[in-house]
Structure formats: C-alpha cells, structure tokens
C-alpha cells in the first residue's frame, strides 16, 4: 500500500534565503527573478513558501473526479514516483496526510482546496496544464484533464528525484499544444522497438507529446512487404504495438511517409522501378503509383495512433524531369505539385486524419498555397541559427494557414551533432513561432551520413521540450543545471561541460564544423598512390579534446549512462583521428629518411621497430573503438546499415595491419643488408602540407568525347534552362542527354581521383564546381594540378586553358579575381587515361579558408556554420 509521508520544518525568511535543499545547490529565491527549481521544462509559474519539507510517497493518493480506468492509468505512473529513493531531513516531524490528485470541476471540496492557493491559475492551465500544491496543509495535483494530471505527476517525479525540500506552488501549462520529435530512421540507424519504447518513456517525462519518424523505405506494409530492408524496418504490427505503448505515456505516434520525392530507395527495387517518374521521384500520374501510395499510406494511417499523417513531399528536385516534364511544361510546376498533394489529401482524409506536409516547396512557390485545401498543416523547416525566421513563417502566417515550426538537430555529415547550432535554432525558431501563432513545434533529427546514435541527441531533445513548453528566455540560464539533474541525476555539470568543450572543435580548421570528412578520409594511401595531410591545427584540436576528456571522465551519471558513453566515444574518436595523422606523418618521414640514406644501421632497424609498435598500438585502439561502437549501435538500433558504418574502421584496421607487415619486411631487409622499396610502394606516400586543398566539389559527367577534340564551349549546360551555377541534384544537358550534379568529397586529402568516381572507359569530359564566398574584392593566387588537360574558369571567365601537369606535386599558378559575394569556380577536365585521372586545387596559404561541402569562405569576419 502506498503511503505519503510529509515532514515540515518552519524556517525564517532570512534562513530561507541562504538555504539549499539536499545539498544539491538549488537556492531558494523569489519568483520572477532568476529563481529556478529542478524541473524541466521549467513551469510557467512557481513560488516557494517558508516551509521546509521532507516527504516520501508510499501511500495511494486520494483520487478526485476520476473514473476507475483513469485511476489505473495514472497509478502506474504514480508508482514510478514512489520507487524513487531520496534523502529526508533529519529531525523533521512526520506527517502522514495523503496527496489528493483530481480533476477540477468534479468535486466542490477539492476545487475549494485548490482555489485557496491557486485561484488565479485555474482558468489558465488549459487542457494539458496542472496545478501542484506542496506544503504542510495541502498535497495536491489538480488539472482539467487526465493528461494534465500526468504532467503534474511528472513534475512531482522530478522534484522528488532531485531531493526537493521546499513548500511550493506550481501552475503550469504548455506554450504549444503540439510538441514533437521527428527522428530520421531512413539514412542508416533505425531504432529497435525496445529502444523506441525507451524514447517514449523519456520524452513523456519531459512533456513531449508526439513522436514521429522520417520514413522512406523502412516500413513493411502488409500490402507491399518486399521493399523494406530485411534487417531494418518497422512492421505494421510493431507500429501498432508502439502506438499502444505510447498511449500509456500520454503520447501519440504520427505517421510519416515520403510520398513524392526522396523515393530512390523504393524505386531501386526492380519490381517498383516502373512507378518512378525519375529514379528519385514517384510518378504523380501513374495509376499504379497512386494505388501503391493509397495502400501504404492507408495501412500506416491505421497503425499510427495520432490524428495526423505527414506526407513530407519536400525537395522534389526532379519534378519537371522524366515523365513529368511534358506535364510541367504544360501546366506549370505548382499545379502539378498541387494536384499530387490534393490526391494525397484525399487519401489521408479518407482515413479520418489531418494531412501534414513540409513547407519548402510552398515557400518557393507560394501560389500553391492558394491551390490546396485549407485544413493542411504545413511543417516549415529551417535548422540554422538565424537572426530572423520570418522567411519561413510569413507565407503561412500571412494567409492564416495551419503551420508548425520545425527546428533541427543535425548529425548530418558531422562527427557529433552541433549542439550550439541546435540550441540556438530550436530556441530562436520556437520563440518566433510563438509570436506568429504557429500551432506546434517539431524538432527534426537528421542522420544523413548514417553513423549516428540517438544517445548523442538527447541534449537537443530536452532543449525542444523546454522551448516548446515554456518560451520564456529567462529559463535559459538554469537549463543546463536542470538538464543534468533530470537526465543523469548529477549536479556536477560535467556532461554539459564536456559537450560544449567538444563543440569548440567547430572552430578549429582540422575539425571545422564537426565535419565527418576527417573520419572518412583515408588513413593511408593505396600502394603507389599519394595522400595529402594537413596537420597545422592538430595540436589545437588535441588541447580541446583533452579538456573534454577531463570533464566526461568526471560525469558520473546515476542514470542514462549511454549518453555519457556516446559523448565519450566521440571524444575518443576525435583523439585517435588526430593522433593517427600525426603518427603516420612521422612514420612516413622516418621511412623516407632511411630510404634516401640507404642506411642499414642498427639505428634504422630500431627506428622501424619503434614505428611497428606505434602502428600495432594504433591498430588495437581502432579495434577497441570498433567493438565499442558496434555494441553501442546494437543497444539502440537494428542490424541494418551496421556494415556500412563499420567499414571506415575496417579499412583503417586493414591498412594498418598491411603497413605493419610492410615495415617488418623492410626491417628484415635492413637486417639482411638488402635494399628497401620506396615509401609509396608500401602505402606511405604521405605528403604533409600546410595548404588548404579543396576536397569538396560538385561533379557532373562524364560527357563522351567521341570526335570532339576540344572542351565543350558551354559553362554548365548546352541548354539555357540548365546553364547556371548548380545546386546538389541539379541537372546539366549535353548532346541531348541529362546528367546530374553530384556532391563529392575527396578521401585523399584533396587529390580528386576521377577514375575512382567515374570508372567508365575514357576518353570523356568531367566538370567540377565549387563556389568561394569573399567578404571583400581581392585577387588571390590559385594552384592547380592535373595529369590530364584542364581548363579553369572563375565567374564565367577562363583563367587557364589546356593546362596539364606531370603529377599532383607539380602545379600551375593562376590569379583569380574575386568579387564581394559568391564566386563560381568551374574546372573542366578531359579524362583521357583509362586508369588514372587526378586533379588538385588550392589557394595561397596566407588566406584563411573554411568550408561546408562545396561552399568555401575566404577570410570570414565571423565564422558561419551551414545547417545542412
């Protein structure tokens, strides 16, 4: 039997102002200052009184105005509070009165008790709000609905867990009725059913009330069971199970399915290829494609328990291509888009749900907003730290349409999510949305790149929970403290300190923007090949890593330890990457010195032995990290994509093993007075450079040469429609054939091996594009190399023609005139050789350069971080 025990000690006002409870560092202060309590989200109103309390929850509460089934549902969560152990005050008088938990308006005596302390709040708490009274006379949780009582119990749970010992009055309600997390499970990590249940439990405690998933192909409907990956999917019965589980925690699961673009995964399955207008876009006019969408969306609508369904339909880059070209040419892109969305709207409405859709296309084509049904909810997304979010709200707010703001947590092509950007974006977009009557907040977690763990995202999830419940910026100062006590049961600040120490790597050139290019780059070149390594800022990075290590080692969580393990892993991963680069360069230098001097002395043998040991130690560290990551992945995710994310580990381990074997062979040759082979021949073709080589480009082609001896005369396309600087996914046209511009990142430190990317038979033309943003007008020296003929263009002007160098070490120098703003760089390369075609490009060393993908910035006055 549960028993409530309350102990009360009266303290003077002067004593109160200097008293912390439970030695946890929570200082009692007046309301409307920087006062705080260990609750997240921070309540809208709270006020401490003079009583100091010690209480435990061991008795069933007195239920007021609740049906039997509602009592049973809430009792499940009440018992979770009762299970918490905490310290009570010594020498306190014991009081055994019970908590009263009830619905307002059902019991006059209960209403009167609540009104004595909180009459001014009763009409403000809304459907999801609650009132919590905790003092010597009253132990009350009151609300107008069952879900409000649930949220009141969650607040009590957090107070109890933190060892709260003050009399307090809380009146609380959400700023937004709809507070959702949207988790990407289609780019690699797809959570297990058990882990999703843990997500539900933890999110519900912080008053998140909707969970959804970004789904392209990882759902297995009964009508079409053959497109989902065998080892990574959610089945319809599993979704129903999860919906029922979410309902126990007063949450709902929102169905989501990409219903226009981003369809490549399904269309790549042979039996579904005919449904595509292009390789990435499902046909909006094919009856079989429409039937497919009706089937899949229908099953999903019935399985997900929320009253909404999100059809996505963002980034429809191919609309107007393939089989949609004639239709778009005839009707216009907005009409074709709107017609497909109206079809989807009818499907959703048939299943009794409200349609959600992304807002990027309507922002670019506002006329579509006047073509679509008015009950659609638009999800307008922007993930950057912007000074204003008006651009992303105005098209919807000005028309009084239903819309929700969608900030983001971006793992996207990063080593760890950028929590500086995420925190500012979530807070800024949410506050802007509150002012412009947005109806909800949906934080979208993106995993492009695929090698991520959700346990690295929780800080951003808690920022979402707080910002969507309470938009008051005065709560920001205490957020980190409340986050730690509620996530980890700690008061030392060390997780947050470690997290934001690691975030300092955003500013260091070698780790700029937390880009995962550092991890994807080859550790060692192939035999006979070369790898460029720039270690100029390596020691700066190591200092930051050491700071983060110090904090994470002292975190000492009492719960949710996987968050700490994931951050700790990221720190270890950064350390081994930086140290590997330094050690490999040193070993390559050792070997080159031995080779050039042809020394067979004992000193050379000793040097090689030492280098072999260094390689062996590195190998063991990579093997250990691989095992650690694999276990962490399987703790959260299904088997799907694990082989892909382990591949960089395996390549590094294999390369190190091969190098150790080659070094041992060289050692034996020296011992036997034999000659040794070149560094390049054993995989040590390392070139250390202080230059910033451009590693990220957009490529298109290969265009067949046939009888053409000279480069095509056009810049970007031989048709006016496409002859413009490209964005990812754009097309170019050559001799009547379409080619797509694709993102490319060098794994060789800036040596772009076109034969690896385009192994098609030569000869052919390949185009490479990037842009360079400059804050001022300037002229800079550029250095380029290519073992094939190359032309260089800057802002449409040819600055070098028919250039060819002996190898990547030999460069030609050209002057580039940069205007203020965006400068377009285009390289045209003629790929003649069947097995070898490379180029490099860099600017003079005294220029400070940063980049995000193919977008480069010169001498930035302020650092910018791209939200992609």
Ranges and model annotations:
Residues 793-841:
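Beta-strand-rich ligand-recognition modules
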Residues 13-147, 151, 155, 159-171, ...:
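Acidic, contiguous N-terminal accessory segments
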Residues 1-9:
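Bacterial N-terminal signal peptides
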Residues 48, 123-336, 342-343, 347-356, ...:
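Feature activates predominantly on carbohydrate-active enzymes
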Residues 15-38, 658, 662-751, 828-868:
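Accessory carbohydrate-binding/adhesion or oligomerization-edge regions at the termini
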Residues 768-780, 815-820:
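Extracellular and analogous surface-interaction loops
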Residues 28, 32-49, 54-55, 64-67, ...:
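Substrate-binding groove of N-acetylhexosamine-processing glycoside hydrolases
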Residues 774, 778-792, 825:
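Aromatic-lined ligand-binding clefts that engage carbohydrates, nucleic acids, or primary amines
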């Amino acid at each position: 039997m549960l028993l409530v025990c309350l102990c009360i000690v009266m303290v003077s006002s002067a004593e109160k102002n200097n008293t912390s409870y439970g030695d946890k560092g929570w200082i009692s202060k007046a309301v409307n200052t920087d006062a705080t309590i260990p609750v997240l989200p921070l309540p809208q109103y709270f006020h401490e009184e003079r009583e100091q309390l010690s209480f435990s929850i061991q008795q069933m509460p007195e239920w007021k105005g609740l049906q039997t089934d509602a009592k049973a549902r809430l009792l499940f969560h009440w018992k979770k509070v009762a299970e918490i152990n905490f310290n009570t005050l010594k020498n306190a008088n014991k009081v055994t009165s019970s908590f009263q938990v009830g619905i307002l308006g059902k019991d006059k005596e209960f209403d009167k008790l609540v009104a004595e302390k909180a009459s001014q709040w009763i009409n403000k708490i809304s459907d999801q709000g609650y009132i919590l009274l905790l003092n010597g006379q009253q132990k009350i949780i009151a609300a107008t609905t069952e879900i409000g009582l649930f949220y009141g119990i969650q607040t009590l749970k957090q107070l109890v867990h933190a060892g709260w010992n003050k009399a307090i009055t809380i009146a609380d309600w959400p700023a937004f009725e709809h507070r959702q997390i949207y988790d990407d499970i289609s780019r690699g990590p797809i959570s297990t059913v058990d882990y999703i249940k843990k997500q539900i439990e933890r999110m519900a405690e912080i008053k998140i009330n909707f969970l959804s998933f970004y789904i392209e192909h990882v759902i297995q409907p009964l009508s079409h069971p053959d497109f989902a990956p065998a080892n990574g999917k959610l089945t319809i019965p599993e979704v129903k199970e999860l919906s029922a589980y979410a309902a126990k925690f007063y949450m709902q699961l929102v169905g989501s399915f990409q219903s226009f673009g981003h369809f490549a995964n399904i269309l790549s399955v042979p039996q579904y290829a005919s449904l595509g207008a292009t390789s990435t876009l499902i046909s909006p006019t094919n009856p079989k494609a429409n039937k497919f969408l009706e089937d899949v969306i229908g099953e999903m609508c019935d399985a997900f328990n929320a009253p909404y369904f999100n059809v996505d339909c963002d980034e429809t880059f191919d609309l107007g291509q393939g089989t949609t070209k004639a239709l778009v040419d005839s009707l216009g892109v907005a009409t074709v888009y709107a017609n497909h969305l109206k079809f989807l709207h009818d499907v959703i409405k048939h299943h009794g749900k409200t349609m959600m859709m992304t807002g990027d296309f309507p922002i670019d084509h506002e006329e579509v907003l006047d073509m679509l049904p008015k009950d659609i909810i638009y999800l307008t997304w922007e993930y950057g730290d912007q000074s204003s979010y008006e651009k992303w709200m105005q098209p919807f707010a000005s028309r009084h349409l239903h819309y929700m703001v969608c900030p983001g947590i971006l793992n996207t092509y990063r080593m760890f999510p950028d929590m500086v950007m995420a925190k500012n974006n979530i807070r800024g977009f949410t506050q802007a949305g509150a002012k412009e009557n947005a109806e909800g907040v949906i934080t979208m977690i993106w995993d492009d790149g695929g090698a991520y763990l959700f346990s690295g995202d929780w800080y951003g999830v808690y920022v979402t929970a707080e910002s969507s419940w309470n938009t008051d910026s005065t709560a920001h100062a205490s957020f980190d403290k409340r986050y730690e006590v509620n996530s980890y049961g700690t008061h030392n600040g060390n997780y947050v300190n470690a997290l934001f120490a690691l975030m300092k790597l955003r500013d260091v050139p070698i780790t700029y923007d937390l880009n995962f290019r550092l991890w994807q780059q080859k550790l060692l070149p192939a035999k006979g090949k070369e790898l460029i390594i720039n270690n100029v800022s390596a020691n700066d990075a190591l200092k930051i890593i050491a700071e983060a290590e110090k904090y994470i080692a002292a975190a000492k969580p009492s719960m949710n330890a996987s968050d700490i393990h994931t951050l700790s892993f990221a720190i270890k991963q950064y350390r081994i990457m930086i140290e590997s680069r330094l050690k490999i360069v040193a070993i390559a230098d050792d070997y080159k010195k031995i080779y050039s001097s042809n020394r067979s002395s004992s000193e050379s043998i000793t040097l090689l032995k030492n280098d072999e040991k260094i390689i062996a130690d590195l190998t063991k560290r990579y093997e250990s990290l691989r095992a650690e990551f694999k276990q962490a992945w399987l703790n959260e995710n299904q088997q799907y994509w694990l082989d892909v994310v382990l591949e960089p580990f395996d390549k590094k381990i294999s390369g190190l093993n091969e190098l150790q074997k080659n070094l041992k062979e060289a050692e034996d040759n020296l011992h036997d007075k034999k000659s040794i082979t070149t560094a390049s021949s054993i995989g040590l073709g390392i070139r250390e450079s202080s230059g910033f080589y451009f590693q990220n480009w957009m490529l298109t082609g290969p265009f067949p040469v046939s009888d053409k001896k000279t480069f095509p005369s056009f810049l970007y396309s031989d048709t006016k429609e496409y002859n413009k600087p490209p964005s990812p996914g754009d097309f170019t046209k050559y001799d009547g054939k379409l080619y797509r511009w694709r993102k490319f990142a060098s794994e060789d430190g800036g040596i772009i091996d076109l034969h690896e990317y385009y192994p098609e038979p030569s000869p052919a033309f390949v185009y490479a594009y990037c842009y360079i943003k400059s804050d001022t007008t300037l002229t800079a020296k550029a250095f380029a190399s290519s073992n094939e003929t190359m032309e260089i263009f800057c802002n449409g002007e040819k600055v070098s023609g028919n250039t060819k160098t002996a190898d990547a070490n030999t460069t030609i120098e050209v002057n580039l005139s940069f205007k203020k703003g965006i400068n377009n760089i285009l390289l045209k390369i003629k790929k003649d050789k069947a097995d070898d075609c490379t180029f490099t490009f860099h600017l003079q060393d005294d220029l400070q350069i940063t980049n995000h993908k193919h977008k480069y910035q010169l001498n930035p006055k302020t650092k910018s971080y791209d939200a992609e």
